[in-house]
Structures are given as C-alpha cells and as structure tokens.
C-alpha cells in the first residue's frame, strides 16, 4: 500500500512538473512590458529610502546643531516608525479598497513634504514632529507595493517583482549615502532635505499621471494582459466571498503562517534598521571617517544588497518553476539567507575596514533578500488575493515593530558600553531565531475563512 501511494504521489509530481513546463512554454513570446511597473516600484522605494537615509547621513550635523546625545538621536531615528506602525494596517485596508495608484501618489507627496519640513525644522520638537509625519506617508509604501505586485505579477514572477520593490530601498540607501553626503558638504544638511523632498514630489506627479491597473493599461498587449489576469488569484474561497475587511484582518491574525511570516520579518527587520540608522555613526565613531567617506563606506553594503537581491529574487522564481513544492523552496531559501546574515556576529572581532565592509555587505544583502522573499511567500500562501494589501501590512508591521526598537536599543547599548558589540550580538541572535521560525511556522496556506478549503482528495491542503 505504501509502495502504491508512493507511485501515485510520484506520478502526480511528474504531472505537475510537466504542466508547469508547458505553461512556461505557452508564455514564450508574450511581451514583458509589466516589468516597467516593477521598475516603477524600484524607483518608488528608491525615493522612500533616499528620504530615510538622509537623516542617518546628516545625523552628526544635526546632533551638533541641536546638541543631541546618542539617546536623543535614537528617538529621532525611530520617531517615524511610531506613526509608521500605527498607520500600516489602515494603509493596507485603503490599498485593498482603492488600489495601489491613489494611495501611492497621495502618500508619496505627503512624505516628500515631510522631508522638506525636516530641513526647515527649527527645534528638536519640530524635527521630531516632521519625522512623525514622514512615518504616516511612508507607511503606505509596502502595503501598496504588495497590492501592486499582486495586481501585476504572475505567480512565477512574484519573487523578482518583490526583489525590485525591496532592492529599490537598498538602491536608495546606496546612492543616498553618497549623494546626501555630497549635498551636505556642498550646501548644508538642511538643503539636502529640500532637494531629496523635491525629487519625491516630482515622482508623485509622475505616478499619478502614468500608473494604471492592467485592466486600464492601454500599452499592454491583449496576450500579456490575459496572462496577468489569469494568475492574479482574486477569486475568494466560498466561505470568504462576503468577508468584510475587518473579518479578513481577524482571519489573518488567526493564521499561524501569517504570524510566523510577521515574526520572521521582525527578526530580519531589526538588523536592517540597525544598519539603516546607525551604520554611518558606527563607521564614523570606530574608524574616524569624515562625512563623505562615511557616506561612501555606508553605500557599499547597500549596493551589494540591491544587486544580490535582484539575482536571488530571480533565482527563487526559478525554484518555483522547477519544484513541485515551490512554497517550501522559497521558505528554505529565506532560512538559509537569515543564517548567512548572522555573520554580523563576527563584526566586533575584526579590525580591517575592508573585512568589516565585507561582513556587513554579506549580512545586509542576505537579510534584505530574505525580507523581499518573505513578501513573495506571503503572496504565494495567501489564498484570497483581494486582501494582499492588509496581509502585507501585517508582514511589514512585524518587521517594523522590531525595527522601531533597534535604533533605541542600540542608542542605550552604545551609551552604556561605549561600543557596538552588544548591538551586533542582539541582531545576530534574532537572525538565528528568524531562521527557525520561518522553517517551522510558515508551512500552511493563509486562509481567511473559518472553514478550511478541502481539495478533491478529501484532505486539507498542506504546504510542505
């Protein structure tokens, strides 16, 4: 009996693999203009993180202007995350209700104006308030981005589409680290915020004018539009057809897989925000670098993360096309990346600047790619694509709940110990924990209905 069952499972696996290969051949020759949307997501997140890194590079100048301590700067670094966290789920619900276009250009304009306000701040209080407004605007980026990916990306391209979204962030951090340093030296720290904010306003106008859903995009061929719509996955399970957004949110919160994804994102997000907020200060304090060199050495790990992230995003989609259990392959890849990123634990024990750069580059590239793959895995596991916006919100909330703590905890650790060794230790332990969580927790489909969807075999669906 076991032998017979094994043969049946083997035949089913071979049949599925052959079907996937036929599907892949069937889209050969279909245009890929949808990649313009993926590039648009890259640019969107590029500007998002350009505005974020501005504060990190300008931190030394701002601290001198207002006579701020490391603890004071820790609160300034994390201020935008407070409103960011509060607004994530509302922004996800708005993205699901109104789509990616309206929510994106509105909030992009808002956070760009908040960046300009940061440059115009005249006190610690106004500086803090400007970062709170920045958090409101930027909280929509990933929920809207996740919604746009579900609207535009066939399932076999969600990895690379998510990589474009996430790598735009690291491209912004890479270029911004150098660009903002040069702007500060040339014009001053206030002017750097004016210039980066103006770039965002221009992008908001462009997004309003150019972006449309596939159904309304006149520049798409009929064949490409049909391919996109056939794999969107917005048909709900029967029990969830009339589900309200609030009930959908409750269903997500009851899903063990959703909670595991969010916790994994948090373990990875702590390290990301540690680098994003304190990396320039770490390099300046421990290596005695000036503003321009600090920006340059901060840029290198982000550049590596952007390039490697796109490559690994493409590779994860290749795994999906070849494997009979694609979600398991993506999950395993995330765990491996988190384990590799824990090389940050070795940072306090090396002295050479090139070796420190290498360790940070590997850690940042792996953690950034793991977070991008987590977005793709969420879309893969979510059965009802109509609620991808709020699902992405919960995922990003997990990342940013931990991320909010990173700059504050690091500030206290640095103030108490006079160094960064303890900060790197905390990050490394969380990365190891995240690898365990993703392997053990995110194994089943994310269902919003209370009644499980049962396949023809009579057994509840399970992802291995």
What are the roles of these predicted feature ranges?
Residues 55-56, 250-313, 371, 375, ...:
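Extracytoplasmic gate region of multi-pass secondary transporters
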Residues 67, 99, 120-126, 137, ...:
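Helix-breaking motifs and short loop linkers at transmembrane-helix boundaries and internal kinks
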Residues 78-92, 299-312:
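Central cavity-lining transmembrane alpha-helices of secondary-active solute carriers
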Residues 86-125:
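Conserved MFS/SLC helix-loop-helix module at the cytosolic interface between two early adjacent transmembrane helices
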Residues 130-171:
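Cytoplasmic helix-loop-helix junction between adjacent transmembrane helices
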Residues 165, 169-218:
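Helix-loop-helix hairpin linking two adjacent transmembrane segments in secondary transporters
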Residues 327-374:
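C-terminal transmembrane helical hairpin of 12-TM major facilitator-type secondary transporters
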Residues 382-417:
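A late C-terminal transmembrane helix in Major Facilitator Superfamily
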């Amino acid at each position: 009996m076991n032998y017979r069952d094994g043969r049946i499972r083997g035949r089913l696996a071979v049949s599925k693999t052959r079907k996937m290969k036929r599907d892949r051949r069937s889209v050969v020759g279909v245009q890929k203009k949808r990649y313009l949307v993926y590039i648009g997501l890259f640019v969107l997140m590029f500007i998002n993180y350009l505005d974020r890194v501005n504060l990190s590079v300008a931190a030394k100048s701002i601290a001198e202007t207002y006579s701020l301590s490391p603890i004071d700067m820790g609160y300034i670094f994390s201020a935008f995350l407070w409103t960011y966290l509060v607004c994530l789920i509302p922004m996800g619900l708005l993205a699901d209700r109104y789509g990616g276009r309206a929510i994106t250009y509105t909030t992009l304009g808002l956070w760009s104006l908040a960046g300009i306000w940061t440059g115009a701040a005249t006190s610690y209080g106004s500086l803090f308030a400007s970062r709170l407004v920045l958090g409101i605007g930027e909280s929509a980026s990933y929920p809207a981005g996740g919604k746009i990916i579900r609207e535009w990306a066939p399932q076999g391209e969600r990895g690379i589409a998510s990589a474009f979204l996430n790598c735009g962030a690291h491209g912004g951090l890479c270029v911004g680290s150098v660009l903002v340093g040069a702007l500060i030296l040339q014009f001053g720290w206030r002017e750097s915020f004016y210039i980066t904010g103006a770039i965002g306003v221009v992008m908001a106008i462009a997004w309003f004018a150019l972006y449309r859903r596939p159904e309304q995009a006149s520049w798409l061929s009929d064949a490409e539009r049909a391919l996109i719509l056939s794999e969107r996955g917005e048909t709900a399970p029967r029990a969830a057809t009339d589900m309200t957004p609030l009930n959908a949110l409750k269903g997500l919160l009851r899903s063990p897989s959703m909670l595991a994804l969010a916790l994994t994102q948090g373990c990875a997000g702590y390290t990301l925000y540690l680098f994003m907020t304190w990396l320039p200060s770490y390099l300046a304090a421990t290596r005695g670098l000036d503003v321009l060199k600090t920006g340059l050495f901060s840029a290198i790990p982000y550049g590596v993360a952007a390039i490697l992230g796109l490559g690994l995003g493409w590779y994860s989609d290749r795994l999906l096309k070849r494997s009979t259990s694609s979600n398991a392959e993506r999950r395993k890849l995330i765990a491996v990346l988190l384990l590799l990123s824990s090389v940050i634990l070795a940072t306090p024990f090396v002295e050479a600047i090139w070796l420190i750069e290498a360790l940070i580059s590997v850690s940042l590239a792996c953690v950034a790619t793991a977070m991008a793959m987590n977005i793709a895995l969420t879309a893969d596991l979510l059965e009802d694509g109509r609620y991808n916006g709020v699902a992405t919100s919960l995922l990003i909330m997990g990342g940013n709940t931990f991320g909010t703590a990173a700059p504050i905890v690091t500030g206290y650790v640095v103030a108490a110990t006079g160094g960064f060794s303890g900060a790197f230790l905390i990050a490394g332990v969380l990365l190891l924990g995240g690898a365990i969580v993703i392997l053990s927790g995110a194994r089943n489909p994310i269902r919003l209905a209370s009644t499980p969807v049962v396949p023809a075999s009579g057994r509840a669906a399970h992802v291995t």
